[in-house]
Amino acid sequence: MGSTDSKLNFRKAVIQLTTKTQPVEATDDAFWDQFWADTATSVQDVFALVPAAEIRAVREESPSNLATLCYKAVEKLVQGAESGCHSEKEKQIVLNCSRLLTRVLPYIFEDPDWRGFFWSTVPGAGRGGQGEEDDEHARPLAESLLLAIADLLFCPDFTVQSHRRSTVDSAEDVHSLDSCEYIWEAGVGFAHSPQPNYIHDMNRMELLKLLLTCFSEAMYLPPAPESGSTNPWVQFFCSTENRHALPLFTSLLNTVCAYDPVGYGIPYNHLLFSDYREPLVEEAAQVLIVTLDHDSASSASPTVDGTTTGTAMDDADPPGPENLFVNYLSRIHREEDFQFILKGIARLLSNPLLQTYLPNSTKKIQFHQELLVLFWKLCDFNKKFLFFVLKSSDVLDILVPILFFLNDARADQSRVGLMHIGVFILLLLSGERNFGVRLNKPYSIRVPMDIPVFTGTHADLLIVVFHKIITSGHQRLQPLFDCLLTIVVNVSPYLKSLSMVTANKLLHLLEAFSTTWFLFSAAQNHHLVFFLLEVFNNIIQYQFDGNSNLVYAIIRKRSIFHQLANLPTDPPTIHKALQRRRRTPEPLSRTGSQEGTSMEGSRPAAPAEPGTLKTSLVATPGIDKLTEKSQVSEDGTLRSLEPEPQQSLEDGSPAKGEPSQAWREQRRPSTSSASGQWSPTPEWVLSWKSKLPLQTIMRLLQVLVPQVEKICIDKGLTDESEILRFLQHGTLVGLLPVPHPILIRKYQANSGTAMWFRTYMWGVIYLRNVDPPVWYDTDVKLFEIQRV
């Protein structure tokens, strides 16, 4: 009954606030206390009892009352942080104010006129803590709020375990408390694992949700093309002003990486006990990736003096960016810390793949997209971590889940962002030689995927999944094709033995991409052929010995290479090819690719359910902007190549078939000549046809085809195994052109990808926060909300 009464009183207070036309004095505590002192309303109650329309009405019609509500709520949080929340009543007030601000903040952010409100000063809230009355020293409301949240996240008996055993009199003084002793979870820089406490976890979660809502002002600003714009909320929270920056960074990172959703491995455990840890871990992951939203391409920012107390951070390194969270992340350097982080992320990413004989017996986590963003940030900001990941075959524990997600999401338009981040991570990894070498490890674990069964290595798995994405994904994935093939090019010089299934897939892609209608239907399509020829050349020149399957497939499909060498360039043939294009709506033919049986236990990739919400994404930069070319020297070191001057599309192809203009998200796979913008000419075809790198393959065919034909005639053979045996023991030493230098296209940070990551990350956070629906139905500007 008490709960119903308090809800009723709370609702009455809301109605009073919305109907009062006169400003209510800030000193009228009897009125304001109705919102937090007497109630025990859950966050769901607050969202139900404070409708969006009423918040907007107060904002428009009695703005001073909304301003006072926010000011008073922040004041209560500051008081709670100052006092240390010793009584249950104080704790309840802090939680109620936190929920109310979480509800109201998005409506402050959506109105440009209100955007500066939290950054205006409140008289008497002095920076020096002396309560100076002069406004010059007054702290903006946003700063007071953020510092109070930080203090409250390390408040003994509220969000952390108290270390004192004695009476209330000697309760820990919140000002002298060293929060590094109260880190939430063992892991990086902290060995002690505190006892799990359900109440503390729930309180942390509420405060983190408010913190995330503070940071979400970014959602209400349109994506700016060269956006170096820093989020003022994140900038202040991650600065030296926040004395809890290090322990909070460590707490968030350790909470995520130490989480084990399977618990003690008891089947159906999650059905018996509600897992209160997962919501906290999700919230921690989301707050962490937002605090790390920092454009590494422009990180030549002023530096801090590196004043950290944690030994886990590398003090030998020069101080990093002003954002302390990025700074701390970039300075983690101990092997055991890297191992803890990598094992934790791999365990969580692999969780949705867990197949057991008992259906639904293990808990499946839902925050894999946040984990992928976190993994990306770790690799991008901490090169030592990237090298650690690639040092052993542990990198494959990250690769397999990513390939699973890519394959699973390929038909679902609402998961285009997931496809992009998975491919971006693999592009980043593929720029390192060790990644290609690691792919030669046999693939034995059988994750049920909707792909043909094969026996081979992790390289086979990668190529088979990429083939599936290209041939049976939806059309919005076409901008990713050159990224996918760049990854294959980067690893190709190191692939020791591809399976027959994989060899056939690569030849099928070449066959599909080299049809005249595909080559002539868009200005960039021929680049895909260049990439595939580069793959074949790398394997023939550097890994011929173990790759008899691929050599045999090339011999069998030799007509494709002859057709490319004799590609017609006359106007009638070009016109005829384009006519055929208009009659062929399929982006790629799947004929000629033997699908074979799919893996046991797999389910086909399904399109999104109609009506599924998705958020729009900004276009990604083209592969030429995403990567820079490096040449591998004889000693294995990389030498960066000067970018060659780009020619315009009219006067020919870019150097070596390199994509010269971004393949934009908006670009449809249909012919662009229909809109009158571009149509292929004989000169254009000749300009790149003359650069097709066919010499190595033609020489191989010239040497091997007569020998293979002779074996077949002499022995009356139709058996592949005999031919493969011959190819395995054959050699082309001295018969092929001099090996070309290995070219690697390494990912390079740029403002375009930084903006893409920002929109993707906030889109994920928007869609994942449905209970309560923090941002739903507010006027966000960073992306559009669409229905599939």
Curated annotation (Swiss-Prot):
It is found in: Cytoplasm; Golgi apparatus membrane. Keywords: Cytoplasm, Disease variant, Epilepsy, Golgi apparatus, Intellectual disability, Lipoprotein, Membrane, Myristate, Phosphoprotein. Residues 297-316, 571-681 are annotated as: Disordered. GO terms for biological process: insulin processing; response to glucose; secretory granule maturation; vacuole fusion, non-autophagic. It holds the Pfam family Hid1. It is a lipid-anchor. Residues 590-600, 669-680 have a biased composition (Polar residues). Expressed in heart, skeletal muscle, colon, spleen, kidney, liver, small intestine and lung. Highest expression is seen in brain and placenta. Loss of expression is seen in some breast, cervical, hepatocellular, lung, thyroid, gastric and renal cell-cancer lines. Highly expressed in secretory cell lines. Expressed in almost all regions of the brain, in cerebellum, anterior frontal cortex, and striatum. Its main location: cytoplasm. Disulfide bonds: none annotated. GO terms for cellular component: cytoplasm; cytoplasmic microtubule; cytoplasmic side of Golgi membrane; cytosol; extracellular exosome; Golgi apparatus; Golgi medial cisterna; Golgi trans cisterna. May play an important role in the development of cancers in a broad range of tissues. It is linked to Developmental and epileptic encephalopathy 105 with hypopituitarism: A form of epileptic encephalopathy, a heterogeneous group of early-onset epilepsies characterized by refractory seizures, neurodevelopmental impairment, and poor prognosis. Development is normal prior to seizure onset, after which cognitive and motor delays become apparent. DEE105 is an autosomal recessive form characterized by onset of seizures in the first weeks or months of life. Belongs to the hid-1 family. This is Protein HID1. It comes from Homo sapiens (Human). The gene is HID1.
